[in-house]
Amino acid sequence: VAQFYAEHNEKPFFADLAAFMTSDVVVGMELVAPDAVQKWRQVIGPTNTATARAEAPSSVRASFGTDQTKNAVHGADSLGSYKREAGFWFGGEDPAARPMQTTAVLDNCTLCLIKPHIQREGKTGQVIDAILAAGFEISAMELFNLTRPVIEEFYEVYKGVLPEYLPLIENMSNCPVVALEGRQANAGASFR
């Protein structure tokens, strides 16, 4: 936290910020769009939630923030900040070289793949809400672009058995797929 929020280390609110940011799991996302930093800053609203409620009442911080520290989301304030922050969270292409390690527990869990068509339809959040409503804990989640050979190997047991095998492979190849670990007692059986 001290490294990520280095510009705030000497400020009076830093201890509260550090305590809050390390109190539970944090989800990191890289959002991609033309002028993404500026667009995201507009969506999230002012840092101070009282100001956000007054000046940007439909913003994320006005809707979900409770105070200046617990203001729901973080957003880079410049392209330079974005580059530094993305490097901090996501590192490079090699998962082993990433500064943040997985939160996967690999116990009482099952794998869920949110397929590309769900993402294209903008329903990823609804699927995640349904998983949580069913009593599962989501202990790890990551977005992957899977190649055809990887998808074919993953679904190999269904080749020649599942009539929709080839369309499934086509749909899942070279598209973003959200993989998540869902945890619950007897997760494999209860997830189905």
Question: How does the language model describe each region?
Answer:
Residues V1-R192:
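Non-catalytic terminal and connector segments of soluble metabolic enzymes
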